C-alpha cells in the first residue's frame, strides 16, 4: 500500500509540474502571439482578395520542408499544402496548395478563396466521404527572423470535390501546437502529442484527442495503462486490427539555465479501444522484433502496401552545449503491425543487371545493440558524392550512402547469407530530414526536406519515386534545381531585420498569389 501511494503521489506531482509549465509557457508566449497575430491577420487580408478558385499549370513547387503531402482518395493525385523555407536570414511560410498528377507527371497550383493561414509542421489527413476531404489541424507560424512562434489550434477541411476551404469551429479541442500526429480511425480523427514553444520556454504533450467526423465535436481521451512520454514528431499509424501505433519522436528538457538536452525516443506503444468500446482506450507497451531503425528525429512516415508502415530518412543529432552536428539518413524501413516486426527496405537493383554478391551482414538478433546513429556492416556502403553549384556560386556537396542490396519488407534468413543475384541500385533521394512522403498505387513519392552542409541549411525541392512492389530502383521525377538554392549569411543589423519582415510569407501587397514561407 505504501509503495502504491508513493507512486500515485509521484504521478500527481508530475501532472502538477506539467500544468505549471504549460501556464508559464502560455503567459510568456501571449505577448509574442499578439505580435504574430497582427502579421497573420495582414496575410489573411491579402488572401481575402481571392474571390474565385483558379487552377493553373505550374512548375514544381519551390524548396520546402514540414509541409503535408496527401493522397487523393479517388484520383491519381497528391496534394501538397503549406511548409517552410529558411534562407539563412528569412523564414518563409506557405499556405499554397499544389496538386501533382502521378499519371501525367504534371503540377497544378490551386488558389482557393479564404484558405487557412500560412503554416508548417501541421497535420493533414484525407478521408473519403463527400468526394474526399482533407482535414488540417494546428501547425505553427514563425516571425521573419525565426525567433518567435505562433502555434495554431484551428481545424480546417478542404472539400476536394468542390475545391473549397472551410474552417470547422468546435470547442474542447487540443491546445495550440505543432509537431503533433493525427490519423483517421473509423469516422474519427485521433490526435496525439506535439509541442508548444515560446522564446524562452517550451512544453511537449502526450495527450490524446478525438474529433468525430459525424458530429464535428472534440473529446479528450483518457487512456488507461502507461503510454508514451510527451514528444513530437513521432510515427503514428493505424493497424489492420484497429489499433494505433505510436513510435519514436523527439523531446527536450532543460538541464540548467539556457542548456537543453534532447531525447530521440525509440519506444513503441499501441493505443486501442478497451473491450471494443470506442469511449474507453488503453495504452500498451510494445517490443517489436526485427531490424529496427536507429534512433533519430525528423523521419517521415507513410502507409505502404499490405498495411505496413513505411519509415524514411531523418537525422541523428549529436548535441553539445555550444554546438549541434547531425548525420542525415535516406534509408527505408517497414513496420508490419500484423507480425509486430521491423524490416529493412533495401533495393534489389534492376533485374537486367545480375551479379553475384555476398550479403554484408545478417539480421541482428532480437534485442541486439546497434550504434546510436547507425553503422555499417561487414560489407561497407557505397558513397556517391555529387556537387551542386548554387545560384550564388556556393558549391554544395551532397553525399549519398547506398546500402547493400537485399530483400524489401521481408525478414532475412540465414540461408540468405549465401550468394544472391542483385544489381546495384540507382541513386535515389539524398539523405535528409523532414521530407514529405505519400504512397499511391504502391509507389512511394518523396518530396523536399532538408539537410545541412556545415552551417548552411539546404532545403530541397526534388521529387523521387520508388515502386514498392518491385523495390528495384529510385526514379528522379524532379531534380534539385541549383537556382533555388539561396543562402544569406546571418546579420544582426536592425536594418536587415526590418527588410526581412516585409519578406515574410513571400508576397507583396500588390500580389497575394505568389510564394509565402514557414518554420518548424
Swiss-Prot record:
Composition bias, Basic residues: 1-10
Pfam families on file: Kelch_KLHDC2_KLHL20_DRC7 (PF24681)
Signal peptide: none
Keywords for the protein's UniProt record, in alphabetical order: Kelch repeat, Phosphoprotein, Repeat
Region (Disordered): 1-33, 346-379, 402-431, 481-520
Chain positions found as Phosphoserine: 413, 418
Domain of life of the native organism: Eukaryota
SUPFAM superfamilies: Kelch motif
Kelch repeats: 77-129, 133-187, 188-241, 243-289, 308-361, 443-494
Biased composition (Basic and acidic residues): 11-24
Name of the protein described by the UniProt record: Kelch domain-containing protein 4
Amino acid at each position: 500500500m505504501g509503495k502504491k501511494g508513493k507512486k500515485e503521489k509521484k504521478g500527481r506531482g508530475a501532472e502538477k509540474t506539467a500544468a505549471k509549465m504549460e501556464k508559464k509557457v502560455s503567459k510568456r508566449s501571449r505577448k509574442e502571439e499578439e505580435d504574430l497575430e497582427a502579421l497573420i491577420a495582414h496575410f489573411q487580408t491579402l488572401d481575402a482578395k481571392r474571390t474565385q478558385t483558379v487552377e493553373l499549370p505550374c512548375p514544381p513547387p519551390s524548396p520546402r520542408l514540414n509541409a503535408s503531402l496527401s493522397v487523393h482518395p479517388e484520383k491519381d493525385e497528391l496534394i501538397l499544402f503549406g511548409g517552410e523555407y529558411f534562407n539563412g536570414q528569412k523564414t518563409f511560410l506557405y499556405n499554397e496548395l499544389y496538386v501533382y498528377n502521378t499519371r501525367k507527371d504534371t503540377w497544378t497550383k490551386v488558389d482557393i478563396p479564404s484558405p487557412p493561414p500560412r503554416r508548417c509542421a501541421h497535420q493533414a489527413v484525407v478521408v473519403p466521404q463527400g468526394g474526399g476531404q482533407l482535414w488540417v489541424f494546428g501547425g505553427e507560424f514563425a516571425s521573419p527572423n525565426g525567433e518567435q512562434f505562433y502555434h495554431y489550434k484551428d481545424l480546417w477541411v478542404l472539400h476536394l470535390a468542390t475545391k473549397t476551404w472551410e474552417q470547422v469551429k468546435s470547442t474542447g479541442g487540443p491546445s495550440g501546437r505543432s509537431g503533433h500526429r493525427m490519423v483517421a480511425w473509423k469516422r474519427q480523427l485521433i490526435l496525439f502529442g506535439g509541442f508548444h514553444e515560446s522564446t524562452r520556454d517550451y512544453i511537449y504533450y502526450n495527450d490524446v484527442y478525438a474529433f468525430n467526423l459525424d458530429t464535428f465535436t472534440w473529446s479528450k481521451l483518457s487512456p488507461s495503462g502507461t503510454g508514451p512520454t510527451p514528444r513530437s514528431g513521432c510515427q503514428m499509424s493505424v493497424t489492420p486490427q484497429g489499433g494505433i501505433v505510436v513510435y519514436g519522436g523527439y523531446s527536450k528538457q532543460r538541464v540548467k539555465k539556457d542548456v537543453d538536452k534532447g531525447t530521440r525516443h525509440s519506444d513503441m506503444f499501441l493505443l486501442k479501444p478497451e473491450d471494443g468500446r470506442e469511449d474507453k482506450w488503453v495504452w500498451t507497451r510494445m517490443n517489436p522484433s526485427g531490424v529496427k531503425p536507429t534512433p533519430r528525429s525528423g523521419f517521415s512516415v507513410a502507409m505502404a502496401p499490405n498495411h505496413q508502415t513505411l519509415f524514411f530518412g531523418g537525422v541523428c543529432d549529436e548535441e553539445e552545449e555550444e554546438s549541434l552536428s547531425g548525420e542525415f539518413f535516406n534509408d527505408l524501413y517497414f513496420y508490419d503491425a500484423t507480425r509486430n516486426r521491423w524490416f529493412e527496405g533495401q533495393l534489389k537493383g534492376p533485374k537486367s543487371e545480375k551479379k553475384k554478391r555476398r550479403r554484408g551482414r545478417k539480421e541482428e538478433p532480437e534485442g541486439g545493440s546497434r550504434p546510436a546513429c547507425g553503422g555499417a556492416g561487414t560489407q561497407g556502403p557505397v558513397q556517391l558524392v555529387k556537387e551542386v553549384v548554387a545560384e550564388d556560386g556556393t558549391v554544395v556537396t551532397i553525399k549519398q550512402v547506398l546500402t547493400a542490396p537485399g530483400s524489401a519488407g521481408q525478414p532475412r534468413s540465414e540461408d540468405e547469407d549465401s550468394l544472391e543475384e542483385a544489381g546495384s541500385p540507382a541513386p535515389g533521394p539524398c539523405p535528409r530530414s523532414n521530407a514529405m512522403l505519400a504512397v499511391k498505387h504502391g509507389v512511394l513519392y518523396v518530396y523536399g526536406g532538408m539537410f545541412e552542409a556545415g552551417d548552411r541549411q539546404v532545403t530541397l525541392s526534388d521529387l523521387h519515386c520508388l515502386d514498392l512492389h518491385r523495390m528495384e530502383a529510385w526514379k528522379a521525377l524532379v531534380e534539385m534545381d541549383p537556382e533555388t538554392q539561396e543562402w544569406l549569411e546571418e546579420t544582426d543589423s536592425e536594418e536587415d531585420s526590418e527588410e526581412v519582415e516585409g519578406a515574410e510569407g513571400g508576397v507583396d501587397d500588390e500580389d497575394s498569389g505568389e510564394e509565402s514561407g514557414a518554420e518548424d
